[in-house]
């Protein structure tokens, strides 16, 4: 660890792509619902915290620590973090596992949501992915 004073936040854990799908109603099993619209956004506690802090334009460093797949979703997460001044040097890419994602099915008329989740790379995130000696973060979230 360097002698630089500690500053900023390192957020470690789940980095997820949320696919929000607005549907006309939740169907009974074996039935159909229409998807009216869909969007993609960040998901997972650490990712959400970092994005919120970036939106607040905080003046201290923000860093991500996690495991995403070496796929389109993983690249999207890395780009999104970089575009929001979030250091991704500890956001690792897995060759073996896809990026974790959630399909959030949202009923248009009620706002009620049901989630379908692929654990993907997050299920394999471990302490070995965290090089805590390589960070000067003051806070770990």
Across the structure, where does each feature detected by a protein language model lie?
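Glycine-rich phosphate/adenosyl-contacting loop at the front of the ribokinase-like
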Residues: 1-67, 72-79, 137
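Ribokinase/PfkB-type carbohydrate-kinase core domain
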Residues: 1-20, 67, 75-93, 97, ...
């Amino acid at each position: 660890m360097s002698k630089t004073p500690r500053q900023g936040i390192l957020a470690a854990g789940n980095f997820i792509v949320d696919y929000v799908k607005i549907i006309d109603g939740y169907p009974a099993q074996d039935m159909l619902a229409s998807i009216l619209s869909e969007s993609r956004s960040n998901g997972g506690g650490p990712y959400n915290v970092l994005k919120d802090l970036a939106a607040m334009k905080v003046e201290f460093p923000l860093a991500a620590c996690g495991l995403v797949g070496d796929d389109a979703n993983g690249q999207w997460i890395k780009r999104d973090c970089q575009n929001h001044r979030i250091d991704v040097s500890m956001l690792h890419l897995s060759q073996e596992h896809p990026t974790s994602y959630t399909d959030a099915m949202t009923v248009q008329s009620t706002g009620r949501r049901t989630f379908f989740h692929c654990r993907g790379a997050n299920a394999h995130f471990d302490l070995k992915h965290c090089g805590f000696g390589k960070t000067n973060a003051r806070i770990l979230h």
